[in-house]
Amino acid sequence: MPKGKLFIIEAGDGSGKETQTRLLSERLLHAGHRVIPVSFPDYASESSMLVRMYLRGDFGTQAEDVNAYAAAAFFAVDRYASYRMKWGQAYEHGAIIIADRYTTSNMAHQAVKLTDAGERDAYLDWLYDFEFQKMGLPMPDAVFFLDMEPDAARHLILARARQKGMVPDIHEQNAAYLARTHAAYRMLAARYGWVCIPSSQN
């Protein structure tokens, strides 16, 4: 049996990835496909412990307090555990996987910590080798980038935090970091041929 498909819904924080992942999964299910939606980080799993520690500021209150390679490894290990324990076999047997974030998030969120273009390219090459070659995670068949302006996304982040009584994580609290990450997403989308979907808070 041929392998399944892996589709990624990608965007900056607060841009509606969870909603779009659910809607696409439901549409494909209704069309008769075997579909498994997944979300990263996998907060319900022990594998996300280092991610949770990083995002709540245990290693430093600024994203830049943890270097790109270390932070990327936290997220990659969480993905590896999810793949091996939750959806890898289904994918290998033909299921469609719809992921809310993936390696593509590591590409944007950690690359912005590197100001030199050569260092960013070296990081992206390392990440490709680390996650797809060394760890053996499957490569996406398509990436859909929800392109929402960071000011609009930040408004939604803060509204969601108030509604749920939560504290935004160290990425979400930093407006300048969110703006740089959004610019990185646009650059990556152009470089790697992601499908760009203009989005707004409406």
Where are the model-predicted features located?
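Walker A (P-loop) phosphate-binding motif
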Residues: M1-R27
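Residue-level preference for the first positions of well-ordered beta-strands
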Residues: G4-I8, I96-I98, W194
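NTP-dependent small-molecule kinase module
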Residues: L23-S25, D151-N202
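Glycine-rich, phosphate-binding/catalytic loops in enzymes
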Residues: S25-E26, Y54, L114-A117, R160-Q163
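ATP-dependent small-molecule kinase phosphotransfer cores
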Residues: A31-M135
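Structural signal for short hydrophobic segments within the conserved structured cores
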Residues: I36, A142, V195-I197
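Conserved phosphate-donor/acceptor-positioning beta-strand/loop module used by diverse small-molecule
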Residues: A99-Y102, L127, G136-A159
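Arginine/glycine-rich "motif VI" loop of SF2 helicases in the C-terminal RecA-like domain
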Residues: Q133-L137, M187-L188
